[in-house]
Amino acid sequence: MAPDVAWLLVLPLVFRPTLVTGITIQTAIKNFRTLHVDYPMVNYPKGFHGYCNGLMAYVRGKLQDWYCPKIHYVVHAPLEDIQKFCKYSESFCENYNEYCTLTQNSFPVTICTLVHQQAPTSCSYNSTLTNQRLYLLCSRKHDAEPIGIIGLY
């Protein structure tokens, strides 16, 4: 009976890293959908002083972080159009420890750039709307989901 009890104590230690990794990936997938895809594009009230200021207030609230990100990319296209590029990501980006890919198509993207470092409660952003290809981080090598945007091309 003692060996059975020992296995019950050891199994959570063996399986916990897998569960934590799975939860982290699921959170990254959800965050990509909610923080990097805005389709159709939302119009923020005038009090936000521009699209990026409204969006970044939302982003900081969702991340529950006072830190002002220096740059943030938002794609204005259906999620399905973006997802298909992570179905076969053959490249591994060692700097990010994730699979990555460059989209074949250009997408409408808003680049939110921090004007300058300010007090955490008063982040101010410039908006640049462009049409470019995306460098995506993907959740795995095949049949993956996008989990981040690491740049534009």
UniProtKB/Swiss-Prot annotation:
Gene3D superfamilies the record matches: Ribonuclease A-like domain
Entry GO terms, CC: extracellular region
Record keyword Secreted present: yes
Subcellular location: Secreted
InterPro entries: RNaseA (IPR001427), RNaseA-like_dom_sf (IPR036816), RNaseA_domain (IPR023412)
SUPFAM superfamilies from the UniProt entry: RNase A-like
GO MF annotation: an example: nucleic acid binding
This protein's UniProt keywords: Secreted, Signal
A UniProt-annotated Pfam family: RnaseA
Signal peptide range in chain numbering: 1-22
Function: Does not exhibit any ribonuclease activity.
PANTHER family: INACTIVE RIBONUCLEASE-LIKE PROTEIN 13-RELATED (PTHR11437:SF11), RIBONUCLEASE (PTHR11437)
Family: Belongs to the pancreatic ribonuclease family.
Protein name: Probable inactive ribonuclease-like protein 13
